[in-house]
Amino acid sequence: MDLYEYQGRDLFERHGLPVLAGGVATTPEEARAIAERLGGRVVVKAQVKVGGRGKAGGVKLTEGAEETVARATDILGMDIKGHTVHKVMITVTADVAEEYYFSYLLDRANRTFLCIASVAGGMDIEQVAAETPEKVVKEPIDANTGVDVATARRIVTQAGFPAEVADQTVEIAVDLWKAFVAEDATLVEVNPLAKTAEGGLLLLDAKVSLDENAAFRHPDHEALVDQAAVDPLEQAAKEKDLNYVKLDGEVGIIGNGAGLVMSTLDVVAYAGERHGGVKPANFLDIGGGASAAVMANGLEIVLSDPAVKSVFVNVFGGITACDAVANGIVQALALLEQRGEKVTRPLVVRLDGNNAEAGRAILDGANNPLIQRVDTMDGAAERAAELAAAGV
């Protein structure tokens, strides 16, 4: 889960890291109250989860409450790269002398954590690494030992931080690691980490991503979810313990196992190229226990998407045998009818693996005109795409 800048700033502040005083506003009047509380010159920043705010006019320096209200009025509702601005963060300004960069992240490619540090902050770190790689230090972090003072000092020294800020940077590096671990983050990035004219260090920006799989350890993280941006179908699926991601397509996908579902997305996309460009409408993994109730919940979620014109149910029987899955599909359609959910869109079902023949016989015996059984994955994808194209 990616946080807004103001949420990252608040998280840093809770962990004792030095940030600018400020607040977040959703209306011009709230912006006025914050500006009056802070006093003097402030900066008004659009809160969107995308870069390029400054160039788009989403960052403004203001003097006094009236100008802050005017600029907040301009920014709220602004569209920045397809993201509508609903909130602005207002902070005091800082007299910046130098800008540095510091981050911790989960390095999935190398299965470790990584610290990236540079004295060339305030710009895209990837650009810095490409143009002047000697200015960027990348240090793998052992999860068992973490970042203590000695490790932090080694990184700070290697990155070439000036002597006058070295001790402060070491302290921030240790505290930032503690925050990274405590919050189960996959990224904490400070760009810039600024040296002020007075010689102190401030975290002027906050980019934070949290591991949603660790949400059970962090009930407070629920408050960080941007409810306005949550897809209602994804939320409904989450409440039913289903792994669902909405996509932009017409063929609903239900499968058991993430790998199989990913492969199903591919074959449907390929088949769709021959049928008007139809595409997968979702990712939905019902897991290993495809009971009637689970299948009914899955079908209900998929069919709640009005863009779906056909559904491809792709199941490979393993621990859960295909005959159990077939019974689940038949019973699921009956359950949906009982719930008042009139199912009218066709289901293309492919069963393979454990007890596949028995499962196919159950589907054939159901005599449900909505169920079309196809025994190969490619053939089923072709049929589902064809039906979706015909129903568009």
UniProtKB/Swiss-Prot annotation:
Q: What is its EC number?
A: 6.2.1.5
Q: Which reaction does it catalyse?
A: succinate + ATP + CoA = succinyl-CoA + ADP + phosphate; GTP + succinate + CoA = succinyl-CoA + GDP + phosphate
Q: Which Pfam families does the UniProt record give?
A: ATP-grasp_2 (PF08442), Ligase_CoA (PF00549)
One MF term in the entry's GO annotations = succinate-CoA ligase (GDP-forming) activity
Which cofactors must be present for this protein to function?
Answer: Mg(2+)
Q: Which GO terms describe its biological process?
A: succinyl-CoA metabolic process; tricarboxylic acid cycle
The residues listed in the UniProt record as binding Mg(2+), with positions renumbered to this chain, are 191, 205
Read off the Gene3D superfamilies from this record.
ATP-grasp fold, A domain (3.30.1490.20), ATP-grasp fold, B domain (3.30.470.20), Succinyl-CoA synthetase domains (3.40.50.261)
Query: What SUPFAM superfamilies does its record include?
Result: Glutathione synthetase ATP-binding domain-like, Succinyl-CoA synthetase domains
| Binding residues for ATP | 45, 52-54, 94, 99
Which of this chain's residues are annotated to bind substrate? Answer: 256, 318-320
Domain ATP-grasp, by residue range, is: 9-236
Q: Does the keyword Signal apply?
A: no
Q: Look up the record and name the pathway of this protein.
A: Carbohydrate metabolism; tricarboxylic acid cycle; succinate from succinyl-CoA (ligase route): step 1/1
Q: Which GO terms describe its cellular component?
A: cytosol; succinate-CoA ligase complex
* InterPro entries documented for this protein: ATP-grasp, ATP-grasp_succ-CoA_synth-type, ATP_grasp_subdomain_1, Succ-CoA_synthase_bsu_CS, SUCC_ACL_C, Succ_CoA_ligase-like_bsu, Succinyl-CoA_synth-like
Arranged from A to Z, the UniProt key words for this protein are: ATP-binding, Ligase, Magnesium, Metal-binding, Nucleotide-binding, Tricarboxylic acid cycle
| Cofactor binding description | Binds 1 Mg(2+) ion per subunit.
Would the keyword Nucleotide-binding be found if you checked this record's keyword annotation?
yes
Family the entry assigns:
Belongs to the succinate/malate CoA ligase beta subunit family.
**What is known about its subunit structure?**
Heterotetramer of two alpha and two beta subunits.
Record's function text: Succinyl-CoA synthetase functions in the citric acid cycle (TCA), coupling the hydrolysis of succinyl-CoA to the synthesis of either ATP or GTP and thus represents the only step of substrate-level phosphorylation in the TCA. The beta subunit provides nucleotide specificity of the enzyme and binds the substrate succinate, while the binding sites for coenzyme A and phosphate are found in the alpha subunit.
What HAMAP family has UniProt attached to this entry?
Answer: Succ_CoA_beta
The name this protein goes by in its record? Succinate--CoA ligase [ADP-forming] subunit beta
